[in-house]
Amino acid sequence: MEDLADVICRALGIPLIDIDDQAIMLDDDVLIYIEKEGDSINLLCPFCALPENINDLIYALSLNYSEKICLATDDEGGNLIARLDLTGINEFEDVYVNTEYYISRVRWLKDEFARRMKGY
């Protein structure tokens, strides 16, 4: 099987990239990083600044879309990120389906938290 990062790029319909040097920008609103550590591979996307309101933070961290997607803070603690764990997923169709679902969730999160931060 080809490199999983190459499969992710194909699934997203973007040119192959050097994942050590670049992030992936989709539609000028979603920035995705591919993180490889040993045999594991994750997609990371910061989707909003860390909420100041504790209820918004609790809400964000309580969301759970699947066993593969989790929400957390970044290493610096300034942003909420969505992480997709693709470890152990080897078939192109499975990578594609999981990646597409992840992108749809990230877009929803960005919209949801933009509204919450404005008090809607």
Curated annotation (Swiss-Prot):
SUPFAM superfamilies: Type III secretory system chaperone-like (SSF69635). Coiled coil: none annotated. Changing I19T: In plasmid pINV_F6_M1382. Molecular chaperone required for IpgD stabilization and secretion. The keyword Chaperone applies. This is Chaperone protein IpgE. Belongs to the IpgE/SigE chaperone family. It comes from Shigella flexneri. Keywords: Chaperone, Cytoplasm, Plasmid, Virulence.
